[in-house]
Amino acid sequence: MEPRSRRRRSRQLVATFLRDPGSGRVYRRGKLIGKGAFSRCYKLTDMSTSAVFALKVVPRGGAGRLRLRGKVEREIALHSRLRHRNIVAFHAHFADRDHVYMVLEYCSRQSLAHVLKVRRTLTEPEVRYYLRGLVSGLRYLHQQRIVHRDLKPSNFFLNKNMEVKIGDLGLAARVGPAGRCHRVLCGTPNFQAPEVVSRNGHSCKSDIWALGCIMYTVLTGTPPFAAAPLSEMYQNIRDGHYLEPTHLSPSARSLIARLLAPDPAERPSLDHLLQDDFFSQGFTPERLPPHSCHSPPVFAFPPPLGRLFRKVGQLLLTQCRPPCPFTSKEASGPGEEGTEPDHMEAGNEERDPLCTEGRIHLLTLGTPRTGLAGPKGSLALQLEVATRKLFLCLDAGPMAGQDPPGEQRPVLWAPKWVDYSLKYGFGYQLSDGGSGVLFRDGSHMALRPQGGHVSYQPDQGTLWTFTLRDVPSPLRAKLAVLRLFACYMQRRLREEGTVPMPATPASPDISLLSFIADSQAMVMLFSNGTVQVSLKTSQTQLVLSGEDEDLLLTLQEPGGPAVGVSYTLDVLRSHGFTLAVHHHLRHGLHLLQSV
């Protein structure tokens, strides 16, 4: 038998310079960047163009390698025909006496497994981003009647632009006429579907099960099925039995449960997967910063400049019926990132004054406060003001073992919101009964509870106020979105019995300037200077209102007084506040300083 050390040396004997006999290209082999059970991967440079690739090297030769040789030939036959932005590109292949070489796309950010090794867990916006790319690539594979059979984080690669690519098609196979592959047990045990464990064969739905395992893994840091011994884990897989991650959002837990349905027929299709509330209710970044490979990104949502509201305007103006009343799917608000309202439907619900149809006449034309409509200084100024308020509170007093004596003062805050910023905008409801939407193009529209007035302010523009009798046709699309959000949030507040105590009515020009969020909290900045810090896990709200010595910190907690408990600066200086409040304020400050 060949000594182990000698076998190890023979596996490493890959020449520094390699020539493709078919094309005549000469490559220089670089450092080792990855290895698997039967292959190794190196950085590769084309000597004539300096283009950089990844080189997958599979040893050949020996009677025991016949089966492996067949797998390599199948991998080349399948992979070389694939062309998709979310699948690692296959450029060329050649062989010599000792090895088979595959020249592949080079992904400089390594794999998702490398990211997880450093990060341990990912935020839900990141998971949405990665899953969208994976679903796109996997849909293309399935359209080619190919099942991957080994989907896992180490087989998802990231290029320099943080685009995710499906790679390593060593176990991929074409499905037969019945939609299944041969009944073999292959793949990584933690990610195998019940039908695979039961040796009923892989299908496209087996890959979808693997997506559920991947989603669970990147959100929690551990696979859903990781018990020892192997027989126990396989039984848990057959039963679909796993520890439910209660710290995740309800929509994330729901989608994981759908993906990990033991019956393949109950798992969603790839098209239906992207329509799930997990995607429609929360923010999905268009791209991720490179530093997210080693540290959590902070997502800031300042009003974008210069964007037009084309798509939403066309959709609602041409396709939607009269918008009220509405029905909706789920609640949205503190502790969640917002749920998607249903399309506009007629129903038998109580008609709300905010939803009444009618003609709208222009009431007033005015200019908003100085600085609110400024081009670039507005957000920076508001961030500075908000940061100063948080510092005032943090510096006010010592730590306390219990809450200081407070009083109940009605303050203006947002008890409910709907984050649909990817398509329409960010909708919110105020405690005085008013509501507003910060649209993607930076404009703002609000419904005021006094007389049902509508105020509209385009990005860097003047403030317009209307009555509910007439509206210019260019604004009907935005008004439809606003009224949908308003009715949706008001209905959810009534159903949950969490209608806040009425606050002093806000001025007509109050608007949401910006919101900043990460996986744990959200900070909302309003044009009247109010700063709201919302904690997603505890559903606690910290509202900072007033200026300088008149600053008021109001604490809104589930089960607490409907109007909240407010503390003046003098009270905070003399009594201090608890460690939890201090932590929440610090987190809000961190979000503001990260923009």
Curated annotation (Swiss-Prot):
<dbReference type="GO" id="GO:0042981">
    <property type="term" value="P:regulation of apoptotic process"/>
</dbReference>
<keyword id="KW-0460">Magnesium</keyword>
<feature type="domain" description="Protein kinase">
    <location>
        <begin position="27"/>
        <end position="279"/>
    </location>
</feature>
<feature type="domain" description="POLO box 1">
    <location>
        <begin position="413"/>
        <end position="491"/>
    </location>
</feature>
<comment type="function">
    <text>Inactive serine/threonine-protein kinase that plays a role in cell cycle progression and neuronal differentiation.</text>
</comment>
<feature type="active site" description="Proton acceptor">
    <location>
        <position position="150"/>
    </location>
</feature>
<dbReference type="GO" id="GO:0008285">
    <property type="term" value="P:negative regulation of cell population proliferation"/>
</dbReference>
<protein>
    <recommendedName>
        <fullName>Inactive serine/threonine-protein kinase PLK5</fullName>
    </recommendedName>
</protein>
<dbReference type="GO" id="GO:0005730">
    <property type="term" value="C:nucleolus"/>
</dbReference>
<dbReference type="GO" id="GO:2000045">
    <property type="term" value="P:regulation of G1/S transition of mitotic cell cycle"/>
</dbReference>
<keyword id="KW-0479">Metal-binding</keyword>
<feature type="compositionally biased region" description="Basic and acidic residues">
    <location>
        <begin position="340"/>
        <end position="350"/>
    </location>
</feature>
<dbReference type="GO" id="GO:0002357">
    <property type="term" value="P:defense response to tumor cell"/>
</dbReference>
<dbReference type="Pfam" id="PF00659">
    <property type="entry name" value="POLO_box"/>
</dbReference>
<keyword id="KW-0547">Nucleotide-binding</keyword>
<dbReference type="GO" id="GO:0030154">
    <property type="term" value="P:cell differentiation"/>
</dbReference>
<dbReference type="GO" id="GO:0051301">
    <property type="term" value="P:cell division"/>
</dbReference>
<dbReference type="Pfam" id="PF00069">
    <property type="entry name" value="Pkinase"/>
</dbReference>
<dbReference type="InterPro" id="IPR000719">
    <property type="entry name" value="Prot_kinase_dom"/>
</dbReference>
<keyword id="KW-0221">Differentiation</keyword>
<feature type="region of interest" description="Disordered">
    <location>
        <begin position="326"/>
        <end position="350"/>
    </location>
</feature>
<dbReference type="GO" id="GO:0006974">
    <property type="term" value="P:DNA damage response"/>
</dbReference>
<dbReference type="GO" id="GO:0005524">
    <property type="term" value="F:ATP binding"/>
</dbReference>
<dbReference type="GO" id="GO:0005737">
    <property type="term" value="C:cytoplasm"/>
</dbReference>
<feature type="domain" description="POLO box 2">
    <location>
        <begin position="509"/>
        <end position="595"/>
    </location>
</feature>
<comment type="similarity">
    <text>Belongs to the protein kinase superfamily. Ser/Thr protein kinase family. CDC5/Polo subfamily.</text>
</comment>
<dbReference type="GO" id="GO:0010976">
    <property type="term" value="P:positive regulation of neuron projection development"/>
</dbReference>
<keyword id="KW-0963">Cytoplasm</keyword>
<dbReference type="GO" id="GO:0046872">
    <property type="term" value="F:metal ion binding"/>
</dbReference>
<dbReference type="InterPro" id="IPR011009">
    <property type="entry name" value="Kinase-like_dom_sf"/>
</dbReference>
<dbReference type="InterPro" id="IPR036947">
    <property type="entry name" value="POLO_box_dom_sf"/>
</dbReference>
<feature type="binding site">
    <location>
        <begin position="33"/>
        <end position="41"/>
    </location>
    <ligand>
        <name>ATP</name>
    </ligand>
</feature>
<dbReference type="InterPro" id="IPR000959">
    <property type="entry name" value="POLO_box_dom"/>
</dbReference>
<keyword id="KW-0131">Cell cycle</keyword>
<feature type="binding site">
    <location>
        <position position="56"/>
    </location>
    <ligand>
        <name>ATP</name>
    </ligand>
</feature>
<dbReference type="InterPro" id="IPR017441">
    <property type="entry name" value="Protein_kinase_ATP_BS"/>
</dbReference>
<keyword id="KW-0132">Cell division</keyword>
<dbReference type="InterPro" id="IPR008271">
    <property type="entry name" value="Ser/Thr_kinase_AS"/>
</dbReference>
<keyword id="KW-0539">Nucleus</keyword>
<keyword id="KW-0067">ATP-binding</keyword>
<dbReference type="InterPro" id="IPR033701">
    <property type="entry name" value="POLO_box_1"/>
</dbReference>
